[in-house]
Structures are given as C-alpha cells and as structure tokens.
Amino acid sequence: MSFSGEHPGNANNEGPPPPPPPPPPPSHSSAPPSSQGGSARAAPLNGAFHSHQPHSQGYARAEGSNGYRQPYGRGGYRGSGGRYYGGYGYGHGGGGYGYGHGGGGNYGHGHHGYYGYQGEYRGHSGYQRFNSPAPVGTRYSGAAGPAARPPPPPEPEPEQPFELTDDPLFHLTELDRSTDDPRQLDEMRRIFKDSVQLDQKLEQQKLAMWRTELELSLLDTQSAKDALNVQLNQENLDALLMQG
C-alpha cells in the first residue's frame, strides 16, 4: 500500500550506495595536479603533498603531483617515500604504497622475515620498530638457511703395519691381535724370531750333512778305482815274471 505522495521507486530503498573502488595505480611519470574536487590544491614540500581541501563528513580527497586523486582520505600523502599523513585513507605514489591514520603517523618500510612481518612505524615520537607475531599455523615458505651437516663418521683405526722382521705366521694366526700387552707381543715376536733362526740353522746343518755324504760317496768311488788299478798292476807284474 503506497501513499499518493510517495514515489514508487523509493519503496525498496536499501541504503546509500557503497563507495567506489580505488582506481588502478598510475604510472611513474609525473602529471600536473588535477583541478577537480575542491578549491584548495596540494603544495609540494620536499616530495610531500599535503591536502588543504575542506572535509566532507569527516573525509577529504587529496591529490599529488602524479595526477592520482586519493579517495576517502583526510590529510596528505608523501608519494616518494610511501608515507600518508592525515586521516584514514589509501594511496599510491611515485614508487611506493602508503597507508596511515592519525595525526602524523605512517606505515611502511616493511619486509617479510622468517615469521610474521617486520617494519617501522614513525609517529610523533620518532621511529619505532615492531615485529608482528606469526599467526597459528603460519609457516615460512621461503628459502631456509643451510642445513646443519651431519657429524662425520668416526675414522677407522689404522691397521698396524707388518714389520719386515716378523714371521708371516705371527700375523696369519692373528696372534698379533690376541692381546694388547706390548710385553707379550714382544715375547711372541722373540719366540718366532728364535724359531726362524733355529730353522735356518737346521737347514744349514742339513746342507752340511748332504755335502759330507756327497764327499763320502766320491771317496768311495775313488777308492774303488784305486783298488782296480792296484789289481791291474799286480796282474801285469805277474805276467812279466812268468815270461822272464
């Protein structure tokens, strides 16, 4: 049911329209300041642009030398350093983003670390560093530091080199590993050395005995020859005596 003075199009009034989205970021080339949106302009001061426009419902529109009008902002924006002075707003300047609120604070110079976000906040009292805690379940996906190297394996103990004077059986029978007492090892080495020396002397005695046996056999042969010669000479003498 509608009254006669009511406009039919206002029956379904859903409130004021939402604010328009911000325009795309402008290029880095400088453009002359716009003359729309108020009677006051932003005056450059060391790369900073401060707005002097009248406020409308607590908000104002600021613009800088890059031709970009900052929506829903109160105060000024420093484009070269990513700083925003004044009320709530968002802007993009020549080389950096800026966001801020309050009397003279800025938010920027941040970089991501291993966990959370690190940056600097400068208010009236100067620069203050802050580290925001990482949310629960946050995991840094960047390149991790170098992994710790595992400890090297223990080097094997060098084997004891064989002495040239040792008997091979002393190592083949692993008697050198049977004990760690150096005295016992020296005693076993001495026994093996004596055994080797005795074997060598025994071989020498055997060689001498074989030499003697050979000489004896030669003497026996010579003795047999001499006996035959004596017998032959005796027969020759007997034959001469019978002829005479």
Swiss-Prot record:
Keywords for this entry?
A: Activator, Chromatin regulator, Coiled coil, Nucleus, Transcription, Transcription regulation
Q: Which domain of life is it from?
A: Eukaryota
Q: Where is the signal peptide?
A: none
Indicate the principal place this protein occupies in or around the cell.
nucleus
- Record's compositionally biased regions (Pro residues): 15-27
Q: Name one GO cellular component term.
A: nucleus
Instruction: Specify residue ranges for compositional bias: Low complexity.
Output: 28-44
The yes or no answer to whether the keyword Transferase is present is no
Q: Where in the cell is it found?
A: Nucleus
CDD domains noted in UniProt: Lge1 (cd22897)
GO BP terms, alphabetized: chromatin organization
Summarizing the function annotation, the protein's role is: Involved in transcriptional activation. Also required for ubiquitination of histone H2B to form H2BK123ub1. H2BK123ub1 gives a specific tag for epigenetic transcriptional activation, telomeric silencing, and is also a prerequisite for H3K4me and H3K79me formation. Its precise role in H2BK123ub1 formation however is unclear.
Protein's recorded name:
Transcriptional regulatory protein LGE1
Q: Which organism is it from?
A: Eremothecium gossypii (strain ATCC 10895 / CBS 109.51 / FGSC 9923 / NRRL Y-1056) (Yeast)
Q: What is the lineage of its organism?
A: Eukaryota, Fungi, Dikarya, Ascomycota, Saccharomycotina
| Gene expressing this chain | LGE1
